[in-house]
């Protein structure tokens, strides 16, 4: 997704940066995590684990447009990522694109029907979960 820059330290691997970014996310330092995870993405573009963490960092730091693009990139790499669909739906919802959010949230719940998180997101959107018997 990003091109390497001269600021990228050559001795830090994408894995090290991912670990550091995830630690920052855990401590709710979302904007700082985004910076670190962008570096990881430049080193290993298109890696699902990096894209997921980067999307979370963008979303939680109030960068919904960047989160949307990142979760779309994640779904290009891993179309079966139920979290990717959930997170894209949440990003679209935050951007005021509720109609576009619905199908992604429904798909996330269909892929992971036990998820109370996905079910609650659909309910908050005003969409009841569909029965598996519905067409």
Language-model regions, residue ranges each:
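TPR-adjacent "capping" and linker segments in tetratricopeptide-repeat scaffold/adaptor proteins
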Residues: 1-16, 132-134
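Alpha-helical segment of the N-proximal tetratricopeptide repeat
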Residues: 11-43
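Structural signature of tandem alpha-helical TPR/SEL1-like repeats
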Residues: 27-38, 61-73, 95-107, 129-135
């Amino acid at each position: 997704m990003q091109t390497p820059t001269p600021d990228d330290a050559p001795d830090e691997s994408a894995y090290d940066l991912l670990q550091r970014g995830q630690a920052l996310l855990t401590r709710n330092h979302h904007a700082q995590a985004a910076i670190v995870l962008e570096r990881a993405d430049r080193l290993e573009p298109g890696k699902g684990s990096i894209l997921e963490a980067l999307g979370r960092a963008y979303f939680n730091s109030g960068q919904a447009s960047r989160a949307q693009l990142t979760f779309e990139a994640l779904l290009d790499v891993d179309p079966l990522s139920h979290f990717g669909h959930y997170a894209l739906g949440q990003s679209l919802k935050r951007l005021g694109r509720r109609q576009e959010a619905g199908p992604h949230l429904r798909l996330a719940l269909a892929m992971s029907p036990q998820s109370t998180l996905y079910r609650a997101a659909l309910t908050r959107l005003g969409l009841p979960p569909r029965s598996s018997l519905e067409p």
